[in-house]
Structure formats: structure tokens, C-alpha cells
């Protein structure tokens, strides 16, 4: 068999074999095999050309994909598969890119962890879950995260949350709200507690009393339609206690209220 036509098509070349079979190859393939019109090819040579063409094209696609931002190994694999690169060739491309340090999950995760430390708001658990979803290996993730202490991030997030909720909730409920928000952002329970303790929250008794009386009014409107007397007081007490108000403060306020 021989090459009967070579024609440039944008980024690739169309190579026609015996005017019957055609394939697209990269410029690197043309150069590597010194392909020319009328060149004779054996079956094995043609197979080698096809494989290298896939490898070269796939690598070019991967480098284009990586040029926008750093990618994980799995993201590059998925991208190549999506662009119909031969699944048997993809591992070769990945190995080549890793050898040349175009793909390095460890360094990528280090960079992302540092970004989170500088300007992010996530704890280690949230980062780990996100990276696992991106296909990074658990061992690599754990090795990276052991290098970082996100306690300062937790304090920064707590300060921001405090500005949002302080003065609107009793101290106990405020602390519970802060802990829940911090846990939702991937910080451990202990990290959350430590961050709150660092800020040394102090109860504003005057404000808490005002909040308590406001809540009593609200709950009274709700329960007085169904209960009265001792039963009404019991339901009010239980409801207010669940909302984080101090039991003695509730009892004192209800004595004044009734």
C-alpha cells in the first residue's frame, strides 16, 4: 500500500492510502515518519503511524486543555475520552504529561490548599470531598492536607458569621449556629469550638433579655390559642429553652409576663 494524498486541514493533515483509506494525523506524525505522497507503507508501519497520530493529537488536545488552568489527572483523562482519543492510547499520553510535569496532582492540590489558606473559607473535610470528586487519590489528598493548618481560616469565617448573627440570637443558640455553619464548611467540631473560643464571645444580658421578651410575645401568640395556665407556661418554657435561652432567665421573664 502507498500514500496517494496528503492534504493540510486546519490543525491536522488528511492522509489518503491507496485512494480508499484515509486518516487524520498531526504535523509531528508527518515529520516523525517523513510521510510523503507515493510513499510505500507496510501494514505494521501504517498501524504505528495510526497509534502515534492518536498519541500526538491526544497530547496536543491535553496541552490545550491544560493551558487554561491546572487540571487533575482525571480531568485530563475525561477530556481525552470525551474527544474520542483511543482509550488504549490515553494512558501513554497521561504518563508522558506526568513525566514532563504538565500533570501533577500533588502540586496542584498544594496550590489549591494554599489559595484556600490565603483567601478561602473551607475546612480540610470540604476540600477533601471536592478533590475526591475530581478523581484525586485519597492518599495524595491526605498527604497534602497534613501540611496545612486551617485554624486561622476557621477564625476568619467565624468572625464573618458573627457579624451576621450577633445580636439576633441568645449566646447558646449563637454558638450552636456558628458551629453548625463551620462544620458545613468542612471544619471539624474541635476546630469550630476553638475558633469560637478564640473570639471570646460575651453575653449581652440587656440584648438577650430584649430578645427573650420578644420571643415570649411570639410564642405566646402561638400557644395561647391551644393552652392556658400551667400548661401554657410549660409549652412556653420548653419552646424558649430549645431556642437557646437560659432556664432561669425564662422562669424569671415568665413570672413578670404573667
UniProtKB/Swiss-Prot annotation:
Its main location: cytoplasm. InterPro entries: RecX_HTH_1st, RecX_HTH_3rd, Regulatory_RecX, WH-like_DNA-bd_sf. GO terms for cellular component: cytoplasm. GO terms for biological process: regulation of DNA repair. Keywords: Cytoplasm. It is found in: Cytoplasm. Gene3D superfamilies: Winged helix-like DNA-binding domain superfamily/Winged helix DNA-binding domain. Pfam families: RecX_HTH1 (PF21982), RecX_HTH3 (PF21981). Belongs to the RecX family. Modulates RecA activity. This is Regulatory protein RecX. It comes from Streptococcus thermophilus (strain ATCC BAA-250 / LMG 18311).
Amino acid at each position: 500500500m502507498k500514500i496517494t494524498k496528503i492534504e493540510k486541514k486546519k490543525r491536522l493533515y488528511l492522509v489518503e492510502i491507496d485512494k480508499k483509506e484515509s486518516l487524520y494525523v498531526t504535523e509531528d506524525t508527518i515529520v516523525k515518519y517523513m510521510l510523503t505522497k507515493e510513499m510505500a507503507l507496510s501494514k505494521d508501519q501504517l498501524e504505528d503511524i495510526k497509534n502515534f497520530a492518536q498519541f500526538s493529537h491526544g497530547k496536543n488536545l491535553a496541552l490545550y486543555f491544560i493551558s487554561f488552568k491546572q487540571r487533575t489527572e482525571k480531568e485530563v483523562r475525561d477530556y481525552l475520552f470525551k474527544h474520542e482519543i483511543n482509550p488504549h492510547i490515553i494512558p501513554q499520553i497521561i504518563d508522558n504529561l506526568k513525566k514532563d510535569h504538565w500533570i501533577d496532582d500533588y502540586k496542584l492540590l498544594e496550590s489549591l490548599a494554599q489559595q484556600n489558606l490565603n483567601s478561602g473559607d473551607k475546612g480540610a473535610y470540604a476540600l477533601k470531598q471536592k478533590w475526591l470528586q475530581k478523581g484525586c487519590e485519597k492518599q495524595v489528598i491526605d498527604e497534602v492536607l497534613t501540611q496545612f493548618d486551617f485554624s486561622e481560616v476557621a477564625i476568619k469565617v467565624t468572625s464573618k458569621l458573627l457579624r451576621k448573627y450577633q445580636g439576633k440570637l441568645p449566646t447558646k443558640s449563637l454558638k450552636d449556629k456558628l458551629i453548625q455553619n463551620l462544620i458545613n464548611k468542612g471544619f471539624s467540631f474541635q476546630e469550630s469550638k476553638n475558633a469560637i473560643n478564640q473570639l471570646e464571645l460575651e453575653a449581652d444580658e440587656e440584648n438577650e433579655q430584649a430578645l427573650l421578651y420578644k420571643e415570649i410575645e411570639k410564642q405566646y401568640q402561638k400557644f395561647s390559642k391551644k393552652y392556658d395556665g400551667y400548661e401554657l407556661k410549660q409549652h412556653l418554657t420548653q419552646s424558649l429553652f430549645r431556642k437557646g435561652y437560659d432556664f432561669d432567665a425564662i422562669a424569671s421573664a415568665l413570672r413578670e409576663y404573667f
